[in-house]
Amino acid sequence: MENYEACVGFDVCEIPLSAVAQKIMSAMRSGDFMDSRNEGESTNTSKVAKKSSVHYSVLAEHEETQSLGTKNPESLITQTPRGSIELCPQPSITKLTCQLSAGQVQNSISSLGLSSYLIPQCDQEASVLPNMEHKRQHFLKENIGKEDKDNSSLKRKYITCSKSSEKASKHTALEKDTDGTESWPNSRDTRALGERLCDVRYLGDLAKAQLMDALKQAAALVVTLMYKDGSTQLSAKEALTCTVKGIVVLLKSHVGNSTLTLPAHGGALEKDFISEDHCVYIHTEHSPFWDPKQEAHSLFVRNILFWTLRCKCPVVCFNAKDFVRTVLQLYGEDGSWKHVADFVGLDPRVAAWLIDPSDTAPSFEDLVAKHLEKSITVKPSSTFREASRNTLSQNVFMNLKILYDLTMDLCSKLKAYGLWQLFCTLELPLIPILAVMENHKIPVDKEEMERTSALLGARLKELEQEAHFVAGEQFLIMSNNQLREILFGKLKLHLLSQRKHLPRTGLQNQLSTSEAMLNSLQDLHPLPKLILEYRQVHKIKSTFIDGLLAYMKKGSISSTWNQTGTVTGRLSAKHPNIQGISKHPIKISKPWNFKGKEEETVTISPRTLFVSSEGHTFLAADFSQIELRILAHLSGDPELLKLFQESERDDVFSTLTSQWKDIPIERVTHMDREQTKKVVYSVVYGAGKERLAACLGVTVLEATHFLERFLQKYKKIKDFAQTVIGQCHSAGYVTSILGRRRPLPRICAQDQQLRAQAERQAVNFVVQGSAADLCKLAMIRISTAVATSPTLTARLVAQIHDELLFEVEDTQVPEFAALVRRIMESLQQVQTLELQLQVPLKVNLSVGRSWGHLTPLQEILGSA
């Protein structure tokens, strides 16, 4: 990522980085960025070329036709001292035009730069004719040296061009949108969307070669997806359901601190705005009609896009993951997903999230207002008139320049806050991994899912009828108000309870109908137990069964992964939320009228519905008690360290229970172990006494007693928590083991409840954020190993916080399992990040055809 660091004027980090980060850093020292000496030489070359170009330019000005020079238009490029092709500055009014209006002919040919080939202004349909390039060359040669040629001869040239375009216009009538409006940029009156946006579909072979050279020479690329409605990724609303029509790429000719002046709110770009940067439109929507030219265009576009994903220069993109996923969806069916593993684009949303993790989903407009202190409005265009196209192209061009400036500003802030290394090493390499995960589909057993949905639906009806019967009346079982009236108004169960303090609602201070309350009342009357089962069955059916069916496409599903969705650094998933699917099966009574096995109870496990592809096996790799191990490392508690540093033949939580309650380990019951586990994680997650009481099903006083006894046994944990809170009070933020930050402004609040909440969040973040860092690092290292392997084909399909789920070829399971174990457990010591944990990391591996039926892998595979 050296290109990215050079782009914002940073020095290469002195600390040795990971292989991925080193690759990033090495690019920043590459020759693609001109140093001051080379930049000066290139500038001189451009000046000489520009000066000579005046002799062979045709400028239409004040109704006078200027003469052409004697040079061949093929010489519109110059060789730099390094022997590479470099674009020269584009004059403000030099572009190829064939336009006749009001008896006046204006012909102009671009003297230098890519525009002579990228933005020809003849009628665009004529430009697609096979002989158009030859006609243009012939037109130029005929006019060389004829300074006093009569305008009528040029008029005849235009008429020939115009007649050809009329023939071609019949063909392009098929390319209209379904609403009857011609889809831009296929409009009849111009090949380009205004003066800023060029369509690569209409380039000849020479122009295509020049475009590829320009891409390779660009100091930076700024890209955005363009949707069918004319909006882009920079629009305020995310276009989750919009069809991608194309991709716009801004080629930055130089980098550095830009002094771009933004127009006033809602204002348009000035007409005379001149820039040396180039902006191209890459059409990706396929025509329903087969055409050899369409095939050639698709191949050219594929080459451009995959080169963009592998280029050395920085690629700036807002929501870069969506860009990578789109390219893979369009052209990545041949195993080319491995080629995008090296893509590390600069995503300003990720950068802004690292600076302020509480702002999890800002729009482009929000970030510009927040960090550049400018007000802009990104509006899609729904009309395709010439004026609208010009405005649209100027707006897209301008917004991409603003996006570049925004990203450079955020990169500077990352460096100032000490977050640049985390950005380069952890977050940016994760972008293509998440894109590949979204592009890969997980097969689902649809028939079993529909059968399970019917079974759960039948059971819900039975539970509802039973609840009405024991309540003595019908009521809405999902209505908390009606349930409260039955439980406490009619049945008076709160008066029968032996607990003095029953849970109440926060605002109205009414008796609660929460799970904790129902658990405390279920021995007093059958209704609370029925309500608990109804809620459990309803959640499984609505969320994990019917919810999955809603997102299923062609027998499989694929979640959307959010990199910036949490304040702790954890990943989140939606559509569907695969992370929320519990691994613990539930047992329900089988409906009396439901056909099937004769057992009285039925076991439901939503994870069993996820099945591996034919010839493949699921492999799950789970960090064992990673947060507890991090707590032991950070606190330095001798009892916890001893627990993990010695042989782990016994269960960790059983051993903790034995130590805490001072009982032999063989006398530890399952209930004792679960109680210890909940107490431990209440400390890790910063849960309050009330939350712990609800989890344990005890009073707040009892929960307080459990917590105090635990902290008295492991005193260093309490000392660690107090140290973290003190540091947060003084600095205003806390950090993870890899430097991730979370500002907590409420740590100094006058309100005691707000301050206590911030203190719990501080301790929680340090532990949970550190665990998230290690899990992300494991994802990156394993994905890199697979991408660089000539044989391994394993795909990461899901991340459930501490667990990574892979789909592996059956024959590769032993080799891949050994690789995964070695990489994940080696993260105990990462020299490149100056990380050295005091406790070992342990990984549990399990395999199976179904996600819900995984069996532990034999330990021998871990040492193979």
UniProtKB/Swiss-Prot annotation:
Gene3D superfamilies attached to this UniProt entry: 3.30.70.370, 5' to 3' exonuclease, C-terminal subdomain (1.10.150.20), Ribonuclease H-like superfamily/Ribonuclease H (3.30.420.10), Taq DNA Polymerase, Chain T, domain 4 (1.20.1060.10)
Q: Which UniProt keywords apply?
A: DNA damage, DNA repair, DNA replication, DNA-binding, DNA-directed DNA polymerase, Nucleotidyltransferase, Nucleus, Transferase
Activity control note = Inhibited by ddTTP.
Where mainly found?
A: nucleus
GO CC terms in record: nucleus
Give GO BP annotations, semicolon-separated.
Answer: DNA repair; DNA-templated DNA replication
Expression tissues: Expressed only in testis namely in primary spermatocytes and in round spermatids.
Q: Which ranges are annotated Basic and acidic residues under compositional bias?
A: 169-179
Q: Which family does it belong to?
A: Belongs to the DNA polymerase type-A family.
Which protein is depicted?
Answer: DNA polymerase nu
UniProt source species = Mus musculus (Mouse)
Per the record, the gene is: Poln
